[in-house]
């Protein structure tokens, strides 16, 4: 159960997990932008799978912070 209530914006209700998803997406973009110039993607076998796993890990960490 999250600490945040359901938020209503212009008649649309958003569950608290929606904002956790957006926050983890923003952090994912920042981390990916930092990792691209380092050349780490040259060692990654499947970049799309790596990006998905990275996003899932970030979402897990963010969601653990708000529980």
Curated annotation (Swiss-Prot):
It is a multi-pass membrane protein. The keyword Ubl conjugation does not apply. It comes from the Bacteria. Pfam families: DUF1656. It is found in: Cell membrane. Signal peptide: none annotated. InterPro entries: DUF1656. GO terms for cellular component: plasma membrane. Induction: Positively coregulated with aaeA and aaeB by AaeR. The chain crosses the membrane at residues 3-23, 43-63. Its main location: membrane. Keywords: Cell membrane, Membrane, Transmembrane, Transmembrane helix. HAMAP family: AaeX (MF_01546). NCBIfam families: PRK11594.1. Belongs to the AaeX family. This is Protein AaeX. The gene is aaeX.
């Amino acid at each position: 159960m999250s600490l945040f209530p359901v938020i209503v914006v212009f008649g649309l209700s958003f569950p608290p997990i929606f904002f956790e998803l957006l926050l983890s997406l923003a952090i994912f973009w920042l981390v990916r932008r930092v990792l691209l110039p380092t050349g780490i993607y040259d060692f990654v076998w499947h970049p799309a799978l790596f990006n998905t796993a990275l996003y899932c890990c970030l979402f897990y960490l963010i969601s653990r912070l708000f529980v």
